[in-house]
């Protein structure tokens, strides 16, 4: 499918899964659609599963947008509480289109949780409360990482929310990335499990590539395991002359929870920095201009001893302590404070997802998961910016289930192209006019139709129902449609 065909499907208001290989222009198309929506004055929620991906579209993480934070699952009571937060409810109610990028990093349970929050906040039993939902990503990227003692997360396409959205699949097949076409051919060969000895030989030749040593374009070293990353970063830090600045994590609250929180956040318990150190932010702060994954260099320390970080765009940010906390019913159970940085001469392949690097040194000799090689190699724009130290048998393999699902997506995309492209394009602003007219007509007879329920209305509804009033009588009494009355009674668990 071409970008133009996919854009037409998006403009028709369908729920869409947008996918394609590296360089197919997924993010470009999303930005183009976002601009279209803004021109049409359609309120759009711009989100991504990772902070890095969110910055590509000037959005925020879906976790923050939906108010779920670090939650993976939640009880009905907790979901009601999230949906009842005024800020979250208002955001969900005024949004018309929700975009989620980098969805391979979002597991099935979290998508289902977000869907339930949206449904309750918008007071609609339609999937996501009737939002147009646009999911974008590539399941050849690495899946969400499981925390210690937790089961492996289910992939997003196995969620109930995915099944209920009735998604149109838009599989982009054209290559739009500027630069080295050779690396795109290699990535496509790995992606389709059709690579041969010529591909392997070409990657071996990259072992001797000379990468730029200019500090402003410092190349990143990618490893598959954290101990290798830590060792490399400690080695590089030791090479820098000058004094050390040490920052210890401050933990408070329930010790067991604080310890678990320490393992969950990416900031080290003890952070040692020097001027000139390569660092990466490990928390999102959109107001200050950094996200989890933003790279920079320590250019100095301010009068209070906090590190000053120069980003790759030459912007300077003072890295002040950030807070990680666990709450229960607005009560803080544990809280950790630390400078939101870690050393970043080297990072893991998992952490590199969503980044585009000018140059990278990659060690794939210890790959333990299918798809790792594809993710690592797809971080760079060209083979000239790639040095491969080595790779094992696992490095160039892709997940067989993902490969089979990818073939299914291509078939669904072709079906969507034939089905939708022949249809006339509906103008979203015209659709909104139709919706407005419908509401106006409905509210002539039912003045409160589709309005948020108040506590007083709920009390009157319950009293009337328990007094034996019929649905039609309750409808007339409260100025709402019969369907809205039944929906509220179900929500209040008064009827099945």
Task: Walk through the language-model features, giving the residues of each.
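Short, solvent-exposed alpha-helical "recognition" segments
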Residues: 439-441, 489-496
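Short, Lys/Arg-enriched anionic-surface-contact patches
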Residues: 437-459
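Short alpha-helical segment immediately N-terminal to, or the first helix within
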Residues: 9, 463-464
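Short alpha-helical "recognition helix" segments of helix-turn-helix
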Residues: 473-476
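Conserved ATP-binding/catalytic motifs of P-loop helicase motor domains
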Residues: 1-437
């Amino acid at each position: 499918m071409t970008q133009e065909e996919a854009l037409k499907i998006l403009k028709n208001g369908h729920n869409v899964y947008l996918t394609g290989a590296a360089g197919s222009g997924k993010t470009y198309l999303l930005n183009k659609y976002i601009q279209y929506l803004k021109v049409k004055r359609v309120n759009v929620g711009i989100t991504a599963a990772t902070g890095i991906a969110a910055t590509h579209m000037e959005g925020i993480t879906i976790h923050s947008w939906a108010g779920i934070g670090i939650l993976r699952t939640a009880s009905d009571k907790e979901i009601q509480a999230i949906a009842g937060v005024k800020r979250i409810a208002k955001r969900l109610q005024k949004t018309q289109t929700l975009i989620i990028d980098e969805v391979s990093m979002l597991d099935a349970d979290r998508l289902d949780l977000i869907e339930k929050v949206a449904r309750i906040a918008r007071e609609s039993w339609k999937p996501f409360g009737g939002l147009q939902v646009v999911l974008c990503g590539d399941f050849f990227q690495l899946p969400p990482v499981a925390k210690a003692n937790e089961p492996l997360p289910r992939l997003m396409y196995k969620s109930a929310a995915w099944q209920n959205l009735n998604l149109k699949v838009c599989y982009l097949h054209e290559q739009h990335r500027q630069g080295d076409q050779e690396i795109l051919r290699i990535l496509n060969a790995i992606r389709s499990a059709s690579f041969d000895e010529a591909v392997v030989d070409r990657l071996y030749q990259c072992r001797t590539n000379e990468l730029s040593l200019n500090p402003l374009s410092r190349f990143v070293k990618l490893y598959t395991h954290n101990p290798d990353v830590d060792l490399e970063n400690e080695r590089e830090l030791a090479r820098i002359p000058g004094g050390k600045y040490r920052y210890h994590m401050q933990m408070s609250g329930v010790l067991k929870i604080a310890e678990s929180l320490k393992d969950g956040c990416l900031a080290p318990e003890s952070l040692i920095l020097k001027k000139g150190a390569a660092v990466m932010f490990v928390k999102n702060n959109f107001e200050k201009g950094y996200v989890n994954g933003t790279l920079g260099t320590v250019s100095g320390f301010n009068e209070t001893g906090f590190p000053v970080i120069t980003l790759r765009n030459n912007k300077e940010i003072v890295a002040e302590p950030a807070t990680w906390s666990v709450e229960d019913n607005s009560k803080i159970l544990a809280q950790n404070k630390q400078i939101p940085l870690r050393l970043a001469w080297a990072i893991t392949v998992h952490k590199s997802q969503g980044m585009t690097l000018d140059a990278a040194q990659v060690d794939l000799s210890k790959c333990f998961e299918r798809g790792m090689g594809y993710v690592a190699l797809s971080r760079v724009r060209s083979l000239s910016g790639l040095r491969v130290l080595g790779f094992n048998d696992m490095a160039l393999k892709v997940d067989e289930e993902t490969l089979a699902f990818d073939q299914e997506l291509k078939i669904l995309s072709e079906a969507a192209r034939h089905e939708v492209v022949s249809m006339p394009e509906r103008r979203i602003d015209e659709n909104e006019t139709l919706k407005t007219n419908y509401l106006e007509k409905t509210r002539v007879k039912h003045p409160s139709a589709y309005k948020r329920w108040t506590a007083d209305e709920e009390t009157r509804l319950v009293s009337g129902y328990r007094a034996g009033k019929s649905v039609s009588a309750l409808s007339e009494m409260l100025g709402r449609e019969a369907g809205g009355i039944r929906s509220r009674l179900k929500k209040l668990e008064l009827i099945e």
